[in-house]
Amino acid sequence: ITWVTGVQTCALPICSLAFSGSLLCLIWGLIEANRIGWDTSLTTLRLLAGVLLMVLFVVVQRLQLRPMVDLQLFKHPRFVGALLGMFAYAGCAQVMMTLLPFYLQNGLGFTAIASGLGMLPFALTMLTFPKIGTRLSRLLSPASMMALGLTLVGCGNLLSAWAVSMGGYLSFACAIAVTGAGAGLLNGDTQKNIMACVPRDRAGMASGMSTTMRFSAIMLAIGVFGALLASHSQQALTRSLQLNAPGWLAQTDHIVSRVVAGDMVAAMQPLTENARLIVQPLAQQAFVSGFSTVLWVAGLMALLGALLVGTLMRNPIPAVQLSAA
């Protein structure tokens, strides 16, 4: 690290460690909070460490002559809207490619291969709708395109939540096709809109911020949605076991941890044959209840993102102003 007149000119290792450490502590705290409790000192310490490391990252960036991230960009609503669009797309659409197969396995009893095939409606619309988006972009503004894509994602997730609560594959397939359509519309536009907000000589920084936002959103979404799924599934299973099989309440944590991971067989191993006949349907119902909650939250977040992004991105592009500066 080099210091010149009290100003840090090269702090890439510190910035990288601070940002990575912040994400690590936040995700760690979110995931473990459901196991050890949200009111424990360890959970508070992890989340607080994540916030402090993020503050350190911002402070170090502001002290540099040539910062890795130009924080002045965040003064422009359109740039903030473009980043929020990427965050919402990754956190509410892309992450579903990881989470939805768990429902096919645990909720509908599909094999791993059948679950992969069951995701085809999502994949097909995600692959075909970028071409439709190219044509729509001639008629709609970037703000409208982003809002439309996120609205489709939100509606698809809400329809998926309804389909999960109803049961059956056909309605679920139609719902995830809507989510895939929204993801397809957003796939090319998200990074393009971010790049359009910065001068050409800062294109590398914009590309890095776009990629960082994408993967940060995916990691945080998996942590948050995973914690939400585990928490609601555990609550639902505890209530069911208290009514139907109180003798197996001690196995609740083990059963939920394995079911949420997609391994129903391992979840049932500690139980006797007779107990499995009672507990397995209860575990399946608890998982479905928790998964439906996750989809409701993801759907509402995507719709909120559509509103915010559609509003913020109607502001003028700041690239010309930044170039002049």
Where are these regions (language model features)?
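Hydrophobic transmembrane architecture of multi-pass small-molecule transporters
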Residues: 214-311, 324-325
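Transmembrane core module of solute transporters
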Residues: 13-19, 27-28, 39-49, 53, ...
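Symmetry-related core transmembrane helices of the 12-TM Major Facilitator Superfamily/SLC fold
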Residues: 17-22, 46-52, 295-309
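Short, hydrophobic transmembrane alpha-helix segments
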Residues: 32-37
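Hydrophobic alpha-helical segments of secondary membrane carriers
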Residues: 85, 209-213
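Single conserved hydrophobic/aromatic residue that forms the stacking wall/gate
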Residues: 1-10
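Short, Lys/Arg-enriched, Gly/Pro-containing loop segments at transmembrane-helix junctions
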Residues: 66-72, 237-241, 317-325
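Glycine/proline-centered helix-kink
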Residues: 23, 98, 130, 218-223
